[in-house]
Amino acid sequence: MNNVLQFGLQSSAIYVAKFLVVPLRSLRVGSSFVGVGVGTRSFNKRLMSNATAFSINNSKRKELKIPGAAIDQNCHQMGSDTDRDEMGTLQDDRKEIEAMTVQELRSTLRKLGVPVKGRKQELISTLRLHMDSNLPDQKETSSSTRSDSVTIKRKISNREEPTEDECTNSEAYDIEHGEKRVKQSTEKNLKAKVSAKAIAKEQKSLMRTGKQQIQSKEETSSTISSELLKTEEIISSPSQSEPWTVLAHKKPQKDWKAYNPKTMRPPPLPEGTKCVKVMTWNVNGLRGLLKFESFSALQLAQRENFDILCLQETKLQVKDVEEIKKTLIDGYDHSFWSCSVSKLGYSGTAIISRIKPLSVRYGTGLSGHDTEGRIVTAEFDSFYLINTYVPNSGDGLKRLSYRIEEWDRTLSNHIKELEKSKPVVLTGDLNCAHEEIDIFNPAGNKRSAGFTIEERQSFGANLLDKGFVDTFRKQHPGVVGYTYWGYRHGGRKTNKGWRLDYFLVSQSIAANVHDSYILPDINGSDHCPIGLILKL
């Protein structure tokens, strides 16, 4: 054996020491191959084609066919007892495997029918496991004299061989059935029950390599399944083009569903119905939006046909307003701009309308609250429209006390004063996700600006408890719909967002709201526009 290794079509016996995996760079690629190792490392590895016929003496060889490992019946042959010592020497030499690249390891494992997921060290461990599991131990050696060959086969219920993923998910060696069918090859047909626990224990011990202990396929599959069951986060199959249709929430209730404007908006009002259509949008810098290649103000106006557009965070200076007015779309001839004078290029609000308002007011009329350009109020025939950009509590919640103790109360008083004469529509970026349904990760943002318990309680006390109705939540009580996705973590692609933008209306006109909706497909800002159709 050490001197000569012959391959041919004769009926003479061939003792194949072991199916030895070698680096792909030292092999010629063929449809299938058998690597043969002998005692001396200088002996060349040879490739054999599937077309070559092997005649092997059944009385002097053993086949061990492992489910999930055999690709071709002509491959993966075990050697005779006399070759096992030589094979042990080769198995101890791991340098060739260590030198293989990830691509070579994966290619080799695929040829063996072994799953190839994982990093390089995991692939090396898997390959070693396959080699080790094919070496008969002392008990197998002593028992080999009593039986010519033993074949362990997977139970197959009248179907083809499963794919690699199926093998992993259904516990590759079918241990869950509690026994394995053992069939004697060629001469004798013996059935022996193999203890599933013993096999699992043996596999686990074989997989210990150095400081790492690789769990068996059965244990890995079980662990993955249990972890998937434990996770509280639900993100359904995402749509690349419409990620907002994905229910994305860390702790969703069983009756919640994702907002889909294509299926959740009511039919249009009958022609001739008197109504007004208002849109609002935090543009996060108007100049930047107008330069955004995929944005067209004209196309947006044509598509939505809104009557009034409210903008927040325009970040314009007073000197920029006249230039911007020249770029407005024809028909929207009435625009009103409030800019920050205390901090340039900051905050700012605007109302752009094709309906001429009866009057316009900037700010709240109280000193100390009107220097950042956060409020524009327009009076129309049947309602007041307030466009506001509520102050963010900031990093470290530095402005939290100012917001809840001063700003929120001032805004509430301003609204209630106007409501004495007409119903009020309050819109804009209110910088508060009021309930857990309004934010992807409520538990992780309890001390984040916009979701603190103080801000949420103030939102309720100063607005909702004063008789104002959250129109979107009234129309969609169990729907997860976001209007803001941070740039930092790419939340828009996975629909991990917040609902910060609102239309709140006086209780007296809440029944006149035909539709309160979100337009998540509109890009150009970290917020998206929202709309309101109000019957007059």
From Swiss-Prot:
It is an enzyme of class 3 (hydrolase). InterPro entries: AP_endonuc_1, AP_endonuclease_F1_BS, AP_endonuclease_F1_CS, Endo/exonu/phosph_ase_sf, Endo/exonuclease/phosphatase, SAP_dom, SAP_dom_sf. Probably binds two magnesium or manganese ions per subunit. The keyword Transmembrane does not apply. SUPFAM superfamilies: DNase I-like, SAP domain. Coiled coil: none annotated. Its main location: plastid. PANTHER family: AP ENDONUCLEASE, DNA-(APURINIC OR APYRIMIDINIC SITE) ENDONUCLEASE. The record marks N431 as: Transition state stabilizer. It comes from Arabidopsis thaliana. Pfam families: Exo_endo_phos, SAP. Its cofactor is Mg(2+); Mn(2+). Residues 1-278 are annotated as: Highly charged. It is found in: Plastid, Chloroplast stroma, Chloroplast nucleoid. The record marks D501 as: Important for catalytic activity. The record marks H527 as: Interaction with DNA substrate. The gene is ARP. Residues 97-131 form the SAP domain. Residues 129-168, 203-225 are annotated as: Disordered. Keywords: Chloroplast, DNA damage, DNA repair, Hydrolase, Magnesium, Metal-binding, Plastid. Its EC number is 3.1.11.2. One of its GO terms (biological process) is DNA repair. This is DNA-(apurinic or apyrimidinic site) endonuclease, chloroplastic. Residues 279-536 are annotated as: AP endonuclease. Expressed in the siliques, flowers, and stems. A high level expression is seen in the leaves. Expressed in both vegetative and reproductive organs.
